[in-house]
Amino acid sequence: MEQIIGRKKEIELLTEYYHSGKSEFVAVYGRRRIGKTYLVRNLFRDKFAFDMSGSIEAPAEAQLSNFGFALREYGDSKQPIPTKWTEAFEALKQLLKAKMKGERLVVFIDELPCLDTPKSGFQQAFEHFWNGWAAYQSEIMLIVCGSATSWMIANLIDSHGGLHNRITHEMYLAPFTLRETELMLQAYGFSWTRISILQIYSILGGVPYYLSLLDKKQGVEGNVDRLFFSSHAELKREYGRLYSSLFRNSEAYMRVIEVLASCRQGMTRKEIMEKLKLKSGGTLTKVLSELINCDFVRGYNTRDKKIKQKDQIFQLTDLYTLFYMTFCHPGTTDTGYWTHLMGKPRQNTWYGLAFERVCMLHIPQIKHFLGIDQIHTEYYSWRSKVSKPAAQIDLLIERADNLVNLCEIKYSQMPYTITKEEDMRIRNRMADFVAETGIKSGIIPTMITTFGVRLTQYAALAQVQITMDDLFV
């Protein structure tokens, strides 16, 4: 088995399900290029009793042919190619029956949503296969994968049809953390420093396939130019494919993404509706929910006198999408664009914005550093409705032990200096927050920086300091 980087929890769970001694139906989902197929195939490669993969946008006849060829590979080479899905799953049933010897039989169907072409009868045949037979066979472990998250959620995970409550386990594959990204790059022979890893993570996110495209002979800037700004840049063309593979009617999702990309602070549901000129919010609710499920968007509560879920703020957090919409969507013919921006305010501003997003994606690591892993917390950003200009706090972690970590997030390539003016701004923000919310909890000023805070007369303001290294755990 090829070494699998990261995914420790997922490997433990899949191994546990394999040895459960009962029938298992596991749905693995997540964005395109996240490593779903890689994980399952590497973990169970010599244990498949049957496996096949759906083909994106192929007609029913082609999908059935692929299914039939897989049946031949694992069983009778003279097996007729099925012409409808009831025949296909009946043949699979007979194949598995012939293999039953009291040992686990792993059935893997990759890109399952692709098989559900219009009027093909796939869903009904699949439901009958599982509900009518496979669910009662203790040897069977059925694993299905899909990038089309909207289909996976609607038809499997939250199904109200024949597969309602039939899935025994769902498994969402999230992007890599900074630490997992570091481990992957080390395994590929990179000797990059953590600031370089943070910078590339700020652009690619923790998507394993994107990271696999990096060239260790180039630095961050050279890789970014090659992947985004060269004449045939691989990741410039990825954007449209990404959303069309994840969501049916992807245009609705991309419109929401484009609106959120235009507002750094995030937007309320009402503001999004106004921007898109929507009269009804039913579709928007579904779109936002699925974007959140895929880690493209986060919805965080707001706080006035109390924490309010009703007025949630939605913010684009997918780093690849954010970078694409900021620098590629407008378009440029400069093939060395990112190199030419080195050290300039536009690039530094980007890294500052992205570092805020990276911190939001590493709340568990921040909580671990603070020693509050087991304490219930609410986290959110805050914007004053009174002060002019409006005071804003990047991140607040409100804890059940009656303390609040008021976090200032600062990116720099050297220890951050708190000046007299910055000290005053932070103190004013704290005062505004306490006055407007009426919060009674103790406030702990917390600085999250790349290289710590430079020791000056104002450094004492940062009662807690969290550095970039503390996110790499």
What are these regions (language model features)?
Residues 1-341, 345, 445:
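Phosphate-binding site recognition
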Residues 3, 311-473:
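A cross-kingdom feature that marks ATP-driven nucleic-acid transaction machinery
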